[in-house]
Amino acid sequence: MKRSVPDLMNASEPLVMVTAYDYPGARHAEAAGVDLILVGDSLGNVVLGYDSTAPVTLDDMIHHARAVRRGAPNTFLVVDLPFGTYHTGVTDAMRNAVRVIQQTGADAVKLEGATPEVLDVVGVLARNGIPVMGHVGLMPQTATAQGGLKVQGRDEASARRTLEGALALEAAGAFSVVLEAIPARLARLITERLHVPTIGIGAGVHCRGQVLVYHDLLGLYEGDEKKLAKRYAELGKEAREAIAAYAREVRAREFPTKDQSFVMKDDVLGKLY
């Protein structure tokens, strides 16, 4: 049975979240029993081939989220609001969030940062019944302004900014906060200070949940190993080897065999000559 926001906030075990971007990935995640699925704007990197998440559009997110919902009808679904969809004012943000919920069947939206403008958006969405997941630490949508894709919160100013941002997101109405690429001790402090669940990615074991990117945990891209992710399979290698085996058999006329071919009666064939 799909969990509700109160279920997630009161969970006694660590929450398990994984990204999915399409129907088969969503089916895998739901069958595995995860608590939440995130349709992340990371699809720009791992699915669409962009070098950042910035080019991802709202239409991209809706297209992929609809497929994910069809594959996982019984799992709590969170959809990222991509860059630019909540940065031009509360009215635009509300319109875009409503569109995501209506057109995808998502249960919540996620956005990055804790600036006063973002906090206003979180508050308006939450007060109007749209659950919001926050995100502090490394924020891929604005990573250039943070000095690139690197660990945040290592010095006092950055650590304090991350802590205060998480607290502000909770106060604004976020039901959960993602902590990305921050020291484990800082993540533990934030988790202890918040009443809503923290979900970590590269933030240590003391968060109240964890999230990994589907392609990272399955090893779909050979050689693309990240410190904040663990590979639980090497499907990229298996896929490459399988396609190479198929190519060899085709070129050697070993595929298809009789097992993959259909028959025709001799008398029917004879009438065609």
From Swiss-Prot:
Query: How is its cofactor bound, per UniProt?
Result: Binds 1 Mg(2+) ion per subunit.
Cofactor(s) named in the record: Mg(2+)
Tell me yes or no: is Hydrolase among this UniProt entry's keywords: no
Q: What is its EC number?
A: 2.1.2.11
| Example GO biological process | pantothenate biosynthetic process
* Compartments (UniProt record): Cytoplasm
Q: Sorted alphabetically, which keywords does the UniProt record give?
A: Cytoplasm, Magnesium, Metal-binding, Pantothenate biosynthesis, Transferase
Q: In which pathway does it act?
A: Cofactor biosynthesis; (R)-pantothenate biosynthesis; (R)-pantoate from 3-methyl-2-oxobutanoate: step 1/2
Instruction: Please tell me where Mg(2+) binds in this chain.
Output: D41, D80, E112
Q: Which domain of life is it from?
A: Bacteria
- Which Gene3D superfamilies does this one have? Phosphoenolpyruvate-binding domains
UniProt: 3-methyl-2-oxobutanoate binding residues: D41, S42, D80, K110
Q: InterPro entries, from UniProt?
A: Pantoate_hydroxy_MeTrfase (IPR003700), Pyrv/PenolPyrv_kinase-like_dom (IPR015813), Pyrv_kinase-like_dom_sf (IPR040442)
One GO molecular function term of this record is: magnesium ion binding
This enzyme catalyses: 3-methyl-2-oxobutanoate + (6R)-5,10-methylene-5,6,7,8-tetrahydrofolate + H2O = 2-dehydropantoate + (6S)-5,6,7,8-tetrahydrofolate
Q: Does the keyword Magnesium apply?
A: yes
Q: HAMAP family this protein is in? A: PanB
The UniProt entry's sequence similarity note says: Belongs to the PanB family.
* Described function: Catalyzes the reversible reaction in which hydroxymethyl group from 5,10-methylenetetrahydrofolate is transferred onto alpha-ketoisovalerate to form ketopantoate.
Please give the subunit comment from the record: Homodecamer; pentamer of dimers.
State the protein's name: 3-methyl-2-oxobutanoate hydroxymethyltransferase
Tell me which species this is from: Deinococcus geothermalis (strain DSM 11300 / CIP 105573 / AG-3a)
Q: Which gene codes for it? A: panB
